[in-house]
Amino acid sequence: MYKIFFRLVFKRMDPERAHYAAFRWIRLAARIPVLRTFVAAALAPRHKELRTEALGLRMHGPFGLAAGFDKNAIAIDGMAMLGFDHVEIGTVTGEPQPGNPKKRLFRLVADRALINRMGFNNEGSAAVAARLAARNPVFRTTVGVNIGKTKVVPEDEAAADYVKSTERLAAHADYLVVNVSSPNTPGLRNLQATESLRPLLTAVREAADRTVTTRRVPLLVKIAPDLADEDVDAVADLAVELGLDGVIATNTTVAREGLGLKSHPDLVGEAGGLSGAPLKDRSLEVLSRLYARVGDRITLVGVGGVENAEDAWQRILAGATLVQGYSAFIYEGPAYARAIHQGLAARLAASPYATLAEAVGAETRKQAAA
């Protein structure tokens, strides 16, 4: 049903307009008690065998919504209603900013992919913190907050900008993510270099601990798929050294070669980060490499090209405790999370593993032992 609607309506609309139209409908449904109860019963069934403990948190399942869809913490209940067991909001910057000029979001339908150069358009950390503080949750879900650099802030002042966001948002986050991997903010990816990343993550950790004294807010870093293997290793080692709680692999890619893209060259050539199905293999490679390096010492989150339950299962076998999706949600529609959780439950039942936790990293460990 949704795929017919997508072809007849959404495909003909500007992608950003279609995004906000869907966003409004989800928010509206979540505000109507009878409707949200019905939708949640249909799309967010619980599978007790998928219960997950990660980052010191208990979740109904491992699959959640990646950052980028709900930038301003407006539709958390709506996304939980659709079956996402954690919702990562943002990216949120220290100060509000409009993002890059439109047109800035493109669908590569033939590739089941998106290209975006949104540029961290968001209302800023103060506004988002106020919204989170006032939130009265309808559905129990884990809320991650993804923070990034304000565009006008120079690279050498980035740490202070991230600290500002941390001080405002940490108290309202179940976990925090430092995003240094978007290709759409000039200079941001330079912060992935360990000599820049170490002081940045240290400053954010200290700010979170200083701001929230009643609990330890888990801190993760999100990395790009375009890092060289040795740089992936360096980030992994740094994460362990600094006592980070996790790494999210991966963000969008600036690469176009070698991805087998079928869309029109003019569309493929649009500037920005590419997400969706073509990212699948490289994201999985990075995830496996991270797990081989860090094992179970930190939590890994797999994202990038997760279209279905098999993709999510492969992420878990590679080393991900949590898995996220976004681009495929645009193509698959509201039953996306339900299908993944149902498929994961079936795969776990058919596997040799007694629990989901047992399956985490099993394939990577097997390859290492071969």
UniProtKB/Swiss-Prot annotation:
The keyword Secreted does not apply. Its EC number is 1.3.5.2. Substrate binds at K71, N116, R117, M118, G119, F120, N179, N184, N251, T252. It is found in: Cell membrane. InterPro entries: Aldolase_TIM, DHO_dehydrogenase, Dihydroorotate_DH_2, Dihydroorotate_DH_cat, Dihydroorotate_DH_CS. The active site is at S182. One of its GO terms (molecular function) is dihydroorotate dehydrogenase (quinone) activity. CDD domains: DHOD_2_like (cd04738). One of its GO terms (biological process) is 'de novo' UMP biosynthetic process. Its main location: membrane. Binds 1 FMN per subunit. Its cofactor is FMN. It comes from the Bacteria. Keywords: Cell membrane, Flavoprotein, FMN, Membrane, Oxidoreductase, Pyrimidine biosynthesis. FMN binds at A67, G68, F69, D70, K71, T91, N146, N179, K222, T250, G276, G305, Y326, S327. One of its GO terms (cellular component) is cytoplasm. It is a peripheral membrane protein. It catalyses: (S)-dihydroorotate + a quinone = orotate + a quinol. Pfam families: DHO_dh. Pathway: Pyrimidine metabolism; UMP biosynthesis via de novo pathway; orotate from (S)-dihydroorotate (quinone route): step 1/1. Catalyzes the conversion of dihydroorotate to orotate with quinone as electron acceptor. Monomer. Belongs to the dihydroorotate dehydrogenase family. Type 2 subfamily. This is Dihydroorotate dehydrogenase (quinone). It comes from Streptomyces griseus subsp. griseus (strain JCM 4626 / CBS 651.72 / NBRC 13350 / KCC S-0626 / ISP 5235). The gene is pyrD.
